[in-house]
Amino acid sequence: MLLTHLNEENQPKMVDIGDKETTERIALASGRISMNKEAYDAIVNHCVKKGPVLQTAIIAGIMGAKKTSELIPMCHSIMLNGVDIDILEEKETCSFKLYARVKTQAKTGVEMEALMSVSIGLLTIYDMVKAIDKSMTISGVMLEHKSGGKSGDYNAKK
């Protein structure tokens, strides 16, 4: 497989997307944070001293998507049309599953923005309740779906 982020001298470069067609691009990513019952209950009962955890995680996830190109060296800076975040409460496992859907009209995809959104949202939850549970785990951060562009659609295997 040809690595497009390397030049003829095997040095890093940013891929030129200037000749690519502008199309609608959508990416959906997800991830989970698991914690002890005390931390989970504090979040769902709105008893965390730092404020509303899930709402803050949503805002952080949106910010994460917008800042992706500043943190990932070969990622293009693109205008986002929208970032939608959903957080599901999973009481049985004392966990939260965060989904981020990112949409644009661009010459490159938004997979990295969706993955960054999930990661930053989950890290924000960790930050806000680490005083209650330092053993929280973030897992399963993955691309669920992407559409648009030359490579077409992708759906993760269930």
From Swiss-Prot:
Pathway: Cofactor biosynthesis; molybdopterin biosynthesis. The active site is at residue 127. The keyword Chaperone does not apply. The keyword tRNA processing does not apply. It comes from the Bacteria. It catalyses: (8S)-3',8-cyclo-7,8-dihydroguanosine 5'-triphosphate = cyclic pyranopterin phosphate + diphosphate. Substrate binds at residues 74-76, 112-113. InterPro entries: MoaC (IPR023045), MoaC_bact/euk (IPR047594), MoaC_sf (IPR036522), MoCo_biosynth_MoaA/MoaC (IPR050105), Mopterin_CF_biosynth-C_dom (IPR002820). Pfam families: MoaC (PF01967). Belongs to the MoaC family. Catalyzes the conversion of (8S)-3',8-cyclo-7,8-dihydroguanosine 5'-triphosphate to cyclic pyranopterin monophosphate (cPMP). This is Cyclic pyranopterin monophosphate synthase. It comes from Helicobacter pylori (strain P12). The gene is moaC.
